[in-house]
């Protein structure tokens, strides 16, 4: 799966941080798939956040799993490594925080994230209809995307009484590609470990369909077979014409990850909905709990078991 995955070769050519990050994500997923999550598996997560901060998205899940020591160690290491630098180098802290600011969206040929696709789709619709969409609408749409795709995995994290750690880690990893404003093609090597582990654990054809779509090269060569973008820099900041080619190009990676996100969310939500239908509700950390005996979580007592113990004690 690795050797047939085109973003992997692009990553090796560029020599970026994403391959190491993908390896750390793979270690986490393999650990979660093989045994209950424990202290010996916290190190890859801490290392991944120090290496490339996108796996900080796992923090709500780590809190849900009770990995407070890992969260404390990470906080201490971040403070130890970052605060002195920010204090000694003027302007470094604001420069770092600007990575989280997207500003007003615009065309970016190399950006293959979902948020870029949303902008391109809105602009294309306005162009076809002859309507100039206000900048505030674009900004509002970008904000809505971030809120929506963060709210769902967060809700599933606190509502799931028996979290499947592999599913939850995979869902949070796919969230990154939907909410971050700059997602380049080589970044998609970080979603490959998710598909590798899911394909190892299950025989569902959907994982392979999504993998195949992400593994294929983008259709850009068919759009620009002469490689004019290498000499015409303006092509990087203008829409591809005809517009359907622009949308097809930017959707080539974003839509498969969206499908992965939706499929994982449904796999997690389905047993939660079944419990609701049976009038079994759970909300971490407020609920005393249902039977939470899943990997990486502490087993808590249901109200029924507590009542039974009290009854036996009274006898």
Can you name each region flagged by the protein language model?
Residues 42-45, 93-100, 188-196, 208-212, ...:
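A cytosolic-side transmembrane-helix exit/cap motif
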Residues 1-41, 65-185, 241, 245-247, ...:
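Primarily membrane-embedded glycan-assembly and transfer machineries that use lipid-linked glycans
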Residues 45-62, 179-190:
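Transmembrane helices and adjacent periplasmic/lumenal helix-loop junctions
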Residues 23-35, 61-66, 192-205, 259-271:
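Transmembrane alpha-helices and membrane-interface helical segments
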Residues 199-293, 301, 306, 315:
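Aromatic-enriched
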Residues 17-26, 53-56, 187-196, 256-257:
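Hydrophobic core segments of transmembrane alpha-helices in multi-pass, intramembrane catalytic enzymes
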Residues 3, 40-41, 56-57, 81, ...:
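Hydrophobic alpha-helical transmembrane segments of integral membrane proteins
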